[in-house]
From Swiss-Prot:
The mature protein is largely unstructured in the absence of a cognate ligand. The gene is IAPP. One of its GO terms (cellular component) is extracellular region. Amylin/IAPP is a glucoregulatory peptide hormone that plays an important role in the regulation of energy homeostasis. Selectively inhibits insulin-stimulated glucose utilization and glycogen deposition in muscle, while not affecting adipocyte glucose metabolism. IAPP function is mediated by the CALCR-RAMPs (AMYRs) receptor complexes. Amylin can also bind CALCR receptor in the absence of RAMPs, although it is more selective for AMYRs. This is Islet amyloid polypeptide. Belongs to the calcitonin family. Can form homodimers. Interacts with IDE and INS. Interaction with INS inhibits homodimerization and fibril formation.
Length: 23
């Protein structure tokens, strides 16, 4: 389940990056 957790974290980070672009 560790791999799945890492995948979810990575997806969450990408999701945040898409809607919160750097200034």
């Amino acid at each position: 389940t560790q791999r799945l957790a890492n995948f979810l974290i990575h997806s969450s980070n990408n999701f945040g990056a898409i809607f919160s672009p750097p200034n």
